[in-house]
């Protein structure tokens, strides 16, 4: 029950202050300072407008083992990168599309490296791509998309990625000792969920001496995934994953919210970061055309943050009410898919946080938290 306030002088003062504040000019910001209810969040991120976008499509070629001919594998678009710090450098593993085939673009994973986290040099060929292997049935000819990346305790790297066969997207994963050579392990979900539409696997990890390392909670590794609601899976070894269920179905741990920036869908961003406050998950979202947030564009992809219980990973503790990043630059509002900021790569480098994101499914940009 709310306590009644009888001191009309105080009421008048409060009302007057509110009027003064309400009459101040409104500004639109990409990020906001933490408030008492969002002090757990990783904020603020500022877009580096002076150099964005930092990665663009190019003319690099490689010999496609399936087509058996040379293709310009990144000439259409580059977007949605994972990021990792290795040997004092930042590596981006990014999605790239050619202009070939019935989907007018097969996706592959390329790699670029930077000394400062801002200026990148691409490698000539992709490092992960559809091949004549046992996973071709899942990966061809839509391709391999949207990587997420963390290190493992035994000095390897695990990448989750999406395969697309033209009908169903599936969440797959691969391991590498050096970021250049990858061994595919197949689908994350198996059994009755093997052919379920699944995407965007964000493994829970901690920061250790500048590296982001997959970490166990209650004796298990954990992963958030999904692109409608968010769901979870756990693993003893990072290889064999078991979905978290409720009443025999995938348990939803984060849902869209009517009338808000994340009204249509929610989708994992980078890895989920274990902090002193809990498990911090930066996530992507889409605004409904009708019934969403009227202050942002219809169908816009914006970024939010949520906090989960460090001892009970499916338990949601806090969630930002407003997005902290939205499309407002020309290269974010216009492209292959308009109105998109899609966050996917995060590193702690040179005492700053670098957040890498796809813009309009066409290019790559960066925002920095000091």
What positions do the PLM features span?
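Bacterial N-terminal signal peptides that target proteins for export
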Residues: 2-10
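Sec-dependent N-terminal signal peptides
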Residues: 11-14, 18
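C-terminal motif of bacterial Sec signal peptides marking the signal peptidase cleavage site
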Residues: 20-22
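Beta-rich carbohydrate-recognition and catalytic domains
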Residues: 24-80, 84-142, 150-264, 273-336, ...
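Donor nucleotide-activated moiety binding/catalytic core segment of transferases
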Residues: 262-268, 339-342
């Amino acid at each position: 029950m709310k306590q009644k306030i009888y001191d009309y002088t105080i009421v008048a003062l409060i009302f007057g202050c509110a009027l003064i504040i309400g009459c101040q000019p409104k500004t639109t910001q990409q990020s906001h300072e933490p408030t008492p209810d969002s002090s757990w969040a990783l904020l603020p991120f500022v877009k580096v407008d002076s150099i964005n976008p930092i990665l663009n499509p190019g003319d690099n070629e490689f010999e496609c083992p399936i087509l058996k001919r040379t293709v310009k594998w990144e000439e259409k678009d580059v977007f949605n990168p994972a990021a990792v710090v290795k040997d004092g450098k930042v590596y981006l593993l990014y999605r790239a599309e050619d202009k070939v085939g019935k989907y007018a673009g097969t996706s592959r994973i390329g790699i670029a490296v930077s000394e400062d986290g801002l200026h990148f040099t691409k490698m000539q060929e992709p490092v992960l791509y559809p091949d004549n292997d046992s996973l071709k049935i899942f990966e061809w000819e839509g391709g391999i998309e949207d990587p997420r990346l963390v290190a493992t305790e035994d000095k390897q790297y695990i990448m989750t990625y999406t395969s697309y066969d033209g009908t169903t997207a599936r969440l797959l994963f691969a391991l590498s000792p050096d970021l250049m050579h990858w061994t595919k392990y197949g689908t994350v979900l198996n059994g009755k969920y093997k052919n379920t539409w699944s995407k965007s696997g964000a493994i829970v990890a901690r920061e250790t001496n500048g590296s982001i390392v997959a970490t166990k909670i209650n004796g298990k590794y954990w992963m958030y995934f999904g692109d409608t609601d968010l769901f979870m899976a756990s693993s003893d070894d990072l290889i064999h994953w078991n979905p978290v269920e409720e009443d025999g179905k995938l348990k939803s741990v984060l849902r869209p919210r009517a009338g808000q920036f994340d009204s249509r869908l929610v989708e994992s961003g980078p890895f989920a970061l274990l902090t002193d406050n809990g498990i911090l998950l930066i996530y992507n979202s889409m605004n409904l055309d009708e019934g969403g947030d009227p202050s942002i564009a219809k169908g816009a992809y914006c970024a939010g943050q949520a906090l989960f219980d460090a001892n009970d990973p499916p338990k949601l503790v806090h969630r930002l009410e407003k997005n902290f990043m939205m499309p407002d630059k020309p290269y974010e509002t216009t492209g292959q898919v308009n109105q998109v900021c899609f966050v996917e790569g995060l590193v702690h480098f040179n005492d700053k946080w670098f957040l890498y994101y796809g813009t309009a499914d066409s290019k790559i940009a960066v925002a920095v938290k000091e």
